[in-house]
From Swiss-Prot:
This is ADP-dependent (S)-NAD(P)H-hydrate dehydratase. Keywords: ATP-binding, Lyase, NAD, NADP, Nucleotide-binding. AMP binds at G220. Coiled coil: none annotated. It comes from Flavobacterium psychrophilum (strain ATCC 49511 / DSM 21280 / CIP 103535 / JIP02/86). Catalyzes the dehydration of the S-form of NAD(P)HX at the expense of ADP, which is converted to AMP. Together with NAD(P)HX epimerase, which catalyzes the epimerization of the S- and R-forms, the enzyme allows the repair of both epimers of NAD(P)HX, a damaged form of NAD(P)H that is a result of enzymatic or heat-dependent hydration. One of its GO terms (molecular function) is NAD(P)HX epimerase activity. Its EC number is 4.2.1.136. One of its GO terms (biological process) is metabolite repair. Residues 8-280 form the YjeF C-terminal domain. Homotetramer.
């Protein structure tokens, strides 16, 4: 295994799995997106829509009650389970046959939510993507890393990463700190940036797609949904991270001639995913 690898189209083709012509939505996998709080339901809309647009057969959103109408109207393809609380998640409780879970988008850090997240981590064994406020809660309770399932995928931007590992003086030191956590807990980190890097306990991967258009609100929520979808489709976690990051960046490259940088928004990532997939399989 190489210690460093650039993610280009050939690397993606080696990992991409064509969809069987006899498949059905059950085989395409059921993904759960857990998140949302009052005023931040857009994050769940983006993540869950990206999740189903990326190929998951079924997607359910677990959200506080205040978000039910928002998600059902915005993404009619996505099912909804609501928490008993109106404005934040206080108990994560569901009975579903799932293949993957993404948690954290727009979730907030209410004490009730932190307690619910802890109890969820103690019982969850499914492939997991951890983003946004779930990362921030982890950074305040670093010992909870030991509760994560093997190959859990953490998707921090630079500030979220700093809260998790502390400050660094160079890129080399940053990667070394991340690598230590990967080795200790068998994790995968998606270090969002320019370029985005993916780190596990064996290798570091550098993405080659994307541009400055991705520096927009909700871009990370969409990425979390894409990776959660690929996990639901039974991709190995490292391949889900690699393909997800590549597709996410590729949408910005494809859209640039039409919308430029400034006018590109997170919803454009979702709308361009079909073209990105076609670029891979052409």
């Amino acid at each position: 295994m190489r210690d460093f690898c650039q993610i280009d189209t050939q690397e993606i083709i080696k990992r991409y799995k064509p969809i069987d012509k006899y498949t059905h939505k059950g085989l395409q996998g059921h993904a759960l997106i857990i998140g949302g709080s009052y005023g931040k339901m857009g994050s769940v809309v983006l993540a869950s829509k990206a999740c189903i647009r990326s190929g998951a057969g079924l997607v359910t959103a677990y959200i506080p009650k205040c978000g039910c109408d928002i998600v059902q109207i915005s993404v009619p393809e996505v099912m909804v389970i609501t928490d008993d609380y109106l404005e934040h998640i206080a108990l994560i409780n569901f009975d579903l046959n799932l293949k993957s879970i993404g948690i954290g988008v727009g979730m907030g850090q209410h004490p009730d939510t932190q307690h619910a997240f802890f109890n969820f981590l103690k019982s969850n064994k499914l492939p997991l993507v951890i983003d946004a406020d779930a990362l921030n809660i982890l950074s305040q309770n670093i010992e909870w890393l030991s509760l994560l399932p093997k190959k859990a995928i953490l998707t921090p931007h630079q500030k979220e990463l700093e809260r998790l590992i502390g400050k660094w003086s160079s890129e080399e030191e940053k990667l070394e700190k991340v690598k230590r956590l990967c080795l200790e807990y068998d994790l995968i980190f998606v270090l969002k940036g320019a370029p985005t890097m993916i780190v596990n306990n064996k290798s570091t991967y550098e993405n080659t797609t994307g541009n400055q258009a991705l520096a927009t609100a909700g871009s990370g929520d969409v990425l979390a949904g894409i990776i959660t979808s690929l996990l639901a489709q039974s991709y190995e976690p490292i391949n889900a991270a690699i393909i997800g990051v590549y597709l996410h960046g590729l949408t910005a490259d494809i859209a640039y001639p039409k919308v430029g940088y400034q006018s590109f928004i997170a919803s454009d990532i979702i709308e361009t995913l079909g073209e990105a997939y076609l670029h891979i399989i052409k």
